A protein has these predicted regions:
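N-terminal pre-domains immediately preceding structured catalytic cores
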Residues: 2-219
Length: 219
């Protein structure tokens, strides 16, 4: 079975289908001042956040219509569009803006929430320690707190009983929501991840959709 075919099955499992592949397209937002769609990169993201002290409207938490065959409580992540959906009853979902894996670090698959934590400890994986001098300083673990890269909350993603090393977590860089910036984890701003953490149960199904990304080995 080809990778493309497998990803199609993942999307069918979610009971929904997104538009054409967007993995190579730059994120865009609507600029109400100029009434134009503009590219949203790291520079513009920092400028917008510094000016407004909040995310662009598209990436703010909101309830939206959402059709899916998945039951309420399921998390569906659209990595290409930078949205996380928490399925709600009545054909709705809570939509959160997210940051996702940068080029070469995106992934797709079906996993579950294995455990959760408040103000989690950050322990960088060996691969990150090897390539990142800053991460190497915390090889034994960085205690939770306002400077911790995992932010205020973390949902740990498992395949069966195995930790995937991927997380849904907060961030100390809220302006990065809407961008491809991480090493594979899904990041939300701290207010949003705190809200999500309060609603999600351990064992919840998590479907990660990202066209053009590598599939997690369990799919």
């Amino acid at each position: 079975m080809t990778r493309t075919r497998k990803l199609g099955l993942v999307m069918l499992a979610a009971g929904l289908c997104f538009g054409p592949p967007a993995a190579l397209a730059q994120t865009q937002i609507y600029d109400a001042r100029t009434k134009k769609w503009v590219n949203y990169d790291k520079k513009k993201a920092r400028q917008y956040y510094a000016r407004n002290n909040q995310l662009p409207e598209a990436f703010r938490r909101q309830v939206v219509p959402f059709r899916t065959a998945e039951k309420p409580g399921t998390i569906i992540i659209d990595g290409n569009q930078h949205f996380l959906y928490l399925v709600q009853p009545g054909g709705q979902a809570i939509r959160y803006g997210i940051g996702v894996g940068r080029e070469g670090f995106g992934w797709a698959g079906i996993v579950r929430v294995g455990r959760t934590a408040e103000w989690p400890t950050w322990t960088p994986p060996p691969e990150m320690v090897a390539r990142d001098a800053n991460a190497a300083k915390w090889a034994a673990g960085m205690p939770g707190g306002p400077d911790n890269p995992l932010g205020a909350r973390a949902l740990y993603l498992y395949e069966g009983d195995q930790d995937t090393i991927y997380r849904i977590h907060g961030t100390v860089e809220p302006w990065t929501i809407g961008l491809d910036v991480s090493s594979g984890c899904i990041r939300l701003n701290n207010d949003d991840v705190t809200d999500l953490h309060s609603r999600v149960e351990v064992g919840a199904k998590v479907i990660v959709l990202m066209q053009g990304a590598a599939l997690y080995k369990g799919v």
